[in-house]
């Protein structure tokens, strides 16, 4: 399918519509809409998809206008035919024509008119045999014949119009069905499918790569795993196939979930946000079905990224005394779907890939088999001095700062703070001026404060007070555990 063909069909549809050949115009309009729907599925760029959707809506609106014109014209034809019948059937000046009231009574039903039209044909032949001897009756027979035939033609046109309308309605239903790609869950419970479809992030999380400070290595790896295979599918084949699993390891508050949101925003793939509650059920055997259904839906909506937050709660180490039989079956199904016969790695087409993106704060509790399937295991550390400074600038870009605020000095005093801790410090410091302003005021006085009174710049003293109130949440011993694990099992 080429864009030139779509353009030519649009031109033909508009030309036929301008010339008054509305039936042919509708055929071309319907074909153009179908071609554009098929072409939309091949467009990966979101901006281009929005442009094509706008064009589709404009063409669809033109087709609706043509359809309205057709229905209006048919309405005129159907409304005019009975009026002509009454005018010609009972002429006021012709005294020899019987003014029978029967045809007037039969007007609502179309059946008797067909029978009368046959009789009129017989009368016509009879009048032709007699020639001019029956002169006064000849015009009335002709008029009657014409009058009787016109409703038949109108009914035939009405029938064909209704058939065409039904076919167009069916085709419009088909177009609306092809607009939204819907998973066929034959063999699965409808509630299970709806539960997983709710975890598809269709709305934009609005987190960009630039909104995440530092973590350049992690960004580079995620782009290589998700973005580049979409841009260069001919390169990522065979031994260079895309990574099927990425595990992000690090202390809490370092930006693992933010990286996943950036993947959902930037990478233009279907994004499943899965937690342990999504894949658990109180009914026996349904948790394994959910895992299998998840990967089948992921392959259907491919390219897909499945983000499993806190994966240690779903796939912890097997064989322990605390393990339950149900959780063991769920882990086995997850491992099979990721790297089993017919699993997610069977498809060699990079545009149909299914990648599992996982995050955990307890990597030492993850099962060994899952660790092997998550081929890339990267460490998301605490922000460096440069990262802390960059994170401060991102958090404070909407605040009015006093002249004495030194961001470099604040970043140096935050050594050992995680990204979430730095955000909490900035939030607390931004509230200091408001706290000083409303101190000692009554609730009525606080309500009467103007907006200008509340917008006061944040000073260096506010940051110093916030640093005293907000302590770091990650200990040095925890950092040593993460570094030791990543040194032993890391795969950057």
From Swiss-Prot:
Substrates-to-products reaction catalysed: n ATP + n H2O + a microtubule = n ADP + n phosphate + (n+1) alpha/beta tubulin heterodimers
Signal peptide coordinates: none
GO molecular function, one term: ATP binding
Pfam families found in the cross-reference section: AAA (PF00004), AAA_lid_3 (PF17862), KATNA1_MIT (PF21126), Vps4_C (PF09336)
Binding residues for ATP: 250-257
Keywords: ATP-binding, Cell cycle, Cell division, Cytoplasm, Cytoskeleton, Isomerase, Microtubule, Mitosis, Nucleotide-binding
InterPro entries: AAA+_ATPase, AAA_lid_3, ATPase_AAA_core, ATPase_AAA_CS, KATNA1, KATNA1_MIT, KTNA1_AAA_dom, MT-severing_AAA_ATPase
One GO process term, biological-process aspect: microtubule severing
Entry EC number(s): 5.6.1.1
Region of interest (Disordered), residue spans: 91-158
Comp. bias (Polar residues): 138-147
GO CC, one annotated term: mitotic spindle pole
Chief place where the protein resides: cytoplasm
Family: Belongs to the AAA ATPase family. Katanin p60 subunit A1 subfamily.
Function: Catalytic subunit of a complex which severs microtubules in an ATP-dependent manner. Microtubule severing may promote rapid reorganization of cellular microtubule arrays and the release of microtubules from the centrosome following nucleation.
Protein name (database record): Katanin p60 ATPase-containing subunit A1
Organism (species): Xenopus tropicalis (Western clawed frog)
